[in-house]
Regions:
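Topology signature of small-to-medium multi-pass alpha-helical membrane proteins
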Residues: 1-136
């Protein structure tokens, strides 16, 4: 079966979001690693833990993309939607708690959030529901 337009758009938006997050992570890596909370985590779990967590997170995002867009997994579709909602809540919470943030990382986070929003919307359009074998 040819992938529907919504699934192709999902791939563009979702992978774009992952790319923006990768750039944002690379740009803020040094600052994040010297953060007092990160230093405490490194002391408790080891200096390798932030890097391992980052690799795990990006791997999970790419696996979910593969299973949703290529393997037609309805579970992956819902996992992406649930993680999106949790990420949105975390983003809003971080804005209210952490105070002023640098403009470029904040801007990249907003762009990533917009791309992820568009990707999740694409997963629940009528042609995408048919792709996953769900009723529209």
């Amino acid at each position: 079966m040819v992938r529907p337009k919504s699934i192709r758009l999902f791939e563009l938006f979702y992978l774009g979001s992952v790319l923006v997050e990768a750039v944002n992570t690379a740009m803020t890596w040094a600052e994040t690693n010297t953060n007092p909370q990160t230093m405490q985590v490194k002391q408790m779990l080891g200096p390798w833990f932030p890097a391992l967590l980052t690799v795990f997170t990006f791997s999970l995002w790419l696996l979910l993309w593969y299973f949703a867009a290529r393997a037609r997994s309805n579970i992956a579709r819902w996992a992406i939607a649930i993680l999106y909602v949790l990420g949105l809540i975390g983003f809003v919470f971080s804005l209210t708690v952490s105070g002023p943030q640098s403009a470029i990382p904040l801007g990249l986070s907003v762009v990533s959030l917009i791309l992820t929003t568009l990707a999740v919307v694409c997963l629940f359009r009528r042609d995408a529901s048919a792709w996953f074998g769900a009723s529209a």
